[in-house]
Each structure stands twice: as C-alpha cells, then as structure tokens.
C-alpha cells in the first residue's frame, strides 16, 4: 500500500503538469533549430508528392540505400528502398531479428491539399488566359485567392517522353494567381457563406494576357500562352490530357516569430512528419527489428489508388521480404508495430472555441499522440491499446523526449481520420502520432521547431530500440 501523502506532496507527485519543451532546456532549442534547417530545404524542394518522392530518393541514395529486388535475401544492417509510381517511397533497414518477429513501421504521407489542373484546363476570357483547376483535398477555397502561385508538374508527350517543370519558384520566374472581387463591388459576395466565399468554379488561375499578332486568330491570348509552353516544353494542348500538373503557393518555408521558434510553409501536412521519419530511417544502424519507413500518397483524398495506403504495395513489400527468406508473413504482421504519423491541430488561442483546452495539443509541448482519432463517436478511428501507448511513451520518457496526448478539437465540430486504420486492418497494432500545426490545410501552415525535433527523436528511438 502506498504511503499517505500530504496535499503538497500529492500535488507534486500525482498531478500532470504540461510543460513547453524548449522552456527548460537550451540544448533542445539549438538542436531543434539545426534540424529545422534541413527540413526547410526539404519543404522547398518538395512541394508536390512527385517532388517529395524524388527528394527522398536522392537522400536515400546518398545514404547508401540500394533498390529493392523482390527475390533477393538481405542481411542485417542492409538498407533498401523502392519508389511506387513516382509518388510514394518505402525504405527499410534489415534488423537482427527475423521478419517473423515483426517489423517496426513509421508511416507518413507526402501529398498535401492543393489545386490540380483539369484535363482540358486552358481557356481564354476577355483577353486573359486561364487554367481551370480542380481542388485536391480539404482546402478552404477562399484562402487561395490573391496570392502568388507556382505551377509544378509533368507532361507525357505524344511520343511517350516526359517533361517535368516548375514555374514560379525562382526569383526570376513569373508567378500566377486567382483573382478576387474588390470590396467596393463585393456586396453580393459578402452575403455568401464562408465556404462559398470563392467557389470551386471560380478557382481559375490567371496565366497570361498577351495575344499573338494575327487578327484572324480566334482566342489569340490562349494561343500565345500555348505557343510559349510549346517553345519551352515542346507540348501541345492535347498533352494536358496526359499530364499531372499542380498549383501550389509560390512562397518558401520561412522562420516565424522574432525568436525564430516556428516554421511557416505550405505542405507541413504531412511533410513535417515525413521528413523526420525519413531522417530517422536513414540514421538507423543495426536495428533490433527490420524498420520500414513509408512515405505514402493520396491520404488527403482517402488513401485510394495504387500509391495510397489502401493499396497493397507496402504489405506486398513486407511479404516479399518474408518469402525470399522462407518466413511466414502472417506471423510477421502479427508481431509488427506501427507509428502512423500525421499532423494534428495545434491549440489556437485566436480560435479557442474550436478546442477543448484540457485535451488539446499545443505547439511547443512536444510530439503529440492520439490513442484514437475519428469523428463524432470515434467513427473511422483506429483505437490503440493502453499497452501500446504505454510501451511507446515509456521509451520516450526513458530518453527525455517531450510528448503530449490529446484529441483534435471540441467534440462534434468535425473530426479527422488517419491512415492508421489501413495498417490495423492487416492485424498490425498502430498508434497515431504527429506534430501539432496552426492553420492546418491552409497555404501557409505553422509548426514549432521543438515539436518537429521531438518527432524525429521519437521515430529514431522507435526504429533503433523498439522491441
């Protein structure tokens, strides 16, 4: 039986006192700031899922990873990877224990909310040329007007050759924009609901206004724009039907605050988890269990398709490793553990009514865990066991990693799910984890550098030591 405590002793020993991780330790600030520099460079190089996959592959090759060969057997310590359809990456370090004794997975996604061009996007109206767009993921449409935009993508030309491009990122590049009404003529627009402030059919990107010098040509501005694209990239209008082209904010990742304690950027969701997961995988040496880092695609629209987590590509990779080694993949799945890494909402004092402060997650308090996610009555949640939460948090406590646990926001205001359930459906225990984000799904999201660094430390400890 525990000894009886005084009220003061009880307050000291029994109550949970949340702390801001960087307030107590100067070394954390320095290490977090240094780690954030690499992250900002990654963000600037990886504004689309294709670019994120390419940037990740470059880092893996520089670290000595070799391409996965399905029928080959691998020895402990070897590092392998593959890229799924140019848009998702799987990397692994072979562990000392057999595959049947389980994998250790960290899964994040590298797609972000954005605007995609439609199959036939180019048109002219009143001596302007435009691209029609189709929004991807849960954007708030009104946030995308009147700011500089860049256009990234790839054309597959009629001859089968590919051409990749990005316009709007270099200081000497032109940029693009979606126009909005002036307030002097905005009376009718002001009566719209916020969600309809700018409607989907009004998300048209302004791309030109010069015409070809030929009075007989109809749609002379459209043709002039197309001629410029043809001269630069060798494409025709028909090539847009064989293209994947995305419109993203043109700004770079920047430090936020006089103290530079935060990072503002497009694409924190979910590259703020993907980058530290990748770096932890790269730096893992001689792990106990085989580690698998997955940077997946299509999370923002339900994880469907051949590059999403509802596809089998990750699980086929694990099965192929097992089969080449003559081991049982069912046993391997049953003994595996996964961290599903996706962002969560940081408590925002300016919008406090959307949150429940006792169960919110806060920027600067460390990486956030979620025993469950989902909407309303935990709909579509993957609910981790108390034992799994205990195993992971004990590892972090033993190594001085700052962590917090909570929920997305006030009940019944909305909610959100993650890719955890698609891993859990394979019989693999999963715990949700992520970095808190201010202004999530906006063109300029904000994170705290300390939380980014604590996510990296969590993934590194899990990959190296989790047993």
Give, region by region, the residue ranges found by the protein language model.
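N-terminal hydrophobic/helix-forming segments and targeting peptides
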Residues: 1-467
